[in-house]
Regions:
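Active-site metal-binding loops of divalent metal-dependent hydrolases
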Residues: 1, 38, 124, 153-155, ...
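Charged helix-capping and loop-helix junction motifs
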Residues: 47-51, 133-139
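Structured beta-strand-rich core segments of catalytic domains in phosphoester-bond hydrolases
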Residues: 38-117, 208-211
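Metal-dependent phosphoester-hydrolase catalytic domains
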Residues: 93, 97-100, 113, 130-133, ...
Length: 227
């Protein structure tokens, strides 16, 4: 799920959205939740760590980190330095790792290792060249993983799945969104920017893109089993 980042409310965000997001996530009753552009406690969120607040309200664990590399100038900027990505998971889930791309502004990769599979959460660059360098790094991480892999997040693919076709083939990944339905913007979706991708060994049993407008991106909901 892509957390809201409204331009007009960047300095002081809409405090009413967080309870609505929590209510929506609770209605799905998920085992794992990925959050993109989560605020970890800036003035925009009124010093509330959104990942911790949602996880606490749902009785889940959370792992989060800023989406910028340690040497990025963004680490020095108010508000921006508190923007990150997060996993929320049931208490039995553990074993997170943080990786960083070598290029782009948004560099964070969160890896969540389960007993039978691994999940990578990403937010790729807006720049085409940087995205494809990031995909190369992501491919290397996937190849180092001995378990079936799920990759999810905001890929910023303005050409949709066609832009990552070769990456999918090379990594043995399939999109859960078989109809290539658009996910952005939520008010009138036209672009497929967000993906849940999975390898052989994972069986998707259900997939949905609920039309809720708590964010500028629509959320992706996927049920799966380990084959």
């Amino acid at each position: 799920m892509h957390m809201p980042l409204p331009g007009a409310g960047y300095v002081l965000g809409n405090k009413d959205v967080l309870p609505e997001i929590t209510k929506f996530v609770k209605s799905i009753d998920p085992d794992i939740v990925g959050l993109i552009e989560v605020d970890t406690g800036s003035i925009r969120s009124r010093m509330v760590n959104q990942a911790e607040r949602i996880a606490s309200d749902l009785g889940m664990n959370t792992s989060y980190e800023t989406k910028y590399g340690s040497k990025s100038i963004n680490q020095m900027l108010p508000i921006v330095r508190k923007q990150g990505n997060a996993f929320m998971a049931a208490p039995r889930v553990h074993g997170e790792k943080f990786h960083y791309f070598d290029t782009g502004v948004k560099r964070l990769i969160i890896e969540l290792e389960m007993d039978e599979f691994a999940v990578f959460l990403v937010h790729l660059s807006l720049k085409y060249r940087h995205r494809h360098l990031q995909l190369r790094k992501l491919y290397d991480l996937i190849m180092e993983t001995s378990k079936p892999v799920i990759v999810a997040g905001d890929f910023n693919t303005f050409w949709g799945e066609n832009e990552i076709y070769l990456f999918l083939r090379a990594a043995g990944l399939t999109s859960a969104n078989v109809e290539s339905l658009p996910t952005y913007p939520s008010r009138a979706p036209r672009k497929e920017l967000d993906f849940i991708l999975y390898q052989e060994g994972i069986e998707v049993t259900a997939f949905d893109i609920p039309h809720v407008k708590h964010s500028d991106h629509l959320p992706l909901v996927c049920d799966f089993e380990v084959a």
